[in-house]
Amino acid sequence: MFNNLQDKLDSAFKNLKGQGRITELNVATTVKEIRRALVDADVNYKIAKEFTDKIKDKAVGEKVLNAISPGQLMVKIVKDELTELMGGEEVPLNTKGSPAVILIAGLQGSGKTTFSGKLANYLKTKKGLNPLLVAADIYRPAAMEQLRVLAEQIGVDVHIEAENKDAVSIARSAVASAKSKNKNVVIIDTAGRLAIDELMMTEVANIKNAVTPQEILFVVDSMTGQDAVNTAKAFNDRLDFTGVILTKLDGDTRGGAAISIKYTVNKPIKFVSNGEKMDALDVFYPERMAQRILGMGDITSLVERAQQQFDEEQAKKIESKIRKNKFDFADFKAQLEMIKKMGNMKDLLGMIPGVGKQIKDLDISDDSFKGIEAIIDSMTPEERSNPDLINGNRRKRISNGCGKDIAEVNAFMKQFEQMRDMMKNMNKMGAFGKMMPGGGIGGIKRP
């Protein structure tokens, strides 16, 4: 995420490396490169200029404490200003209503229908609400079918009137149905267009007037950069939405939309969406995003995801086995499954400070650990629960069973033993009481 921008900002900060203090000259040079990096990231020049002028004003004359370098001080100033530019603080979704109505709008292909499903899943699993999805795209039967499939996948009800060609009528009857079924949130997926046009605007405006939504969320594809910002502005000028959703952020190497959109439309970014999985949706926190743009990681979000996925009872059970030095392959695979549920692997690793830059060119997919799983699945139950049983002959059989070279199996076994030794040493030092639930998995490379 935002790798190109990260690299260019890093290069800009290097101007201050080795400098004893901040001066007008070295600030001017650094600020010029930051501005160029932002413009290259598809940030509007006016926004980039105003942003860097603020940085310059704050940086010039700042006293550098002995504990930090001029470069570190500049990074902090840029982080604070980026945070402010993107909204300053999280703005929660308004779900007050009987039921609360959330209208989803956006261009065709922006990820609008997928986001509708993700939002329903988020409200059901994270907020304990009972949502109803509504298919109000009367022009694309495929969109109705997609929403039906997503609703079935996440276990929520969906309102579809396939023969009704009046989107306003569908929205009205869906809200009435939600009231009768004690649904507390209605999510209406409206029709998209290839471009903003009068028909689209009028239809969404009519739905808005008919059902008085608590939220109107405009979904934009972050990979379209400044085009996304311009589209959001045109839509907001006409319909005054309440928040922005950025989709496909995992494929955005530039970051122009995330940085510019709040400034341009003066509406908060409420969620960011990564990938196709229904749980791949994050609340937007400006400060955390600023940290990620600057390559500082996002440990807070990483820990939150871990806490959501790790089962406390299972964590205690595994910790007990670690303390007794009885951690086995079955435990390892169980932990692996929980980590996979946390989201896109490359995205997760990018939340660790300093790691994002190191892995940017690596091919790390959600299938990264399939080789490890294949090796473990080729073991007998007895072998999984007793790693010490696995001798040379058993390794050959496991290699044949999983289709992996014997060298890969041996390498995994060696790494597993090293990890168990590390756990044993950490146990002696009492380190496990300070770790996140389940102890985590460290040191294992994918075969």
Predicted features, each with a name:
Residues 171-175, 179, 183, 195, ...:
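Conserved phosphate-handling catalytic cores of large alpha/beta enzymes
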Residues 141-147, 228-231:
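Short, glycine/polar-rich helix-capping loops at beta-to-alpha or helix-loop-helix junctions
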Residues 184, 188, 204, 342-345:
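Alpha-helical transmembrane segments of polytopic integral membrane proteins
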Residues 16, 42, 78, 107, ...:
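Residue-level signature of catalytic and energy-coupling elements of molecular machines
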Residues 2-19, 288-447:
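Long amphipathic alpha-helical segments used for membrane anchoring, targeting, substrate engagement
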Residues 8-136, 143-190:
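Primarily NTPase-proximal linker/entry elements flanking Walker-type ATP/GTP-binding cores
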Residues 101-103, 132-133, 159, 187, ...:
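Structured core elements
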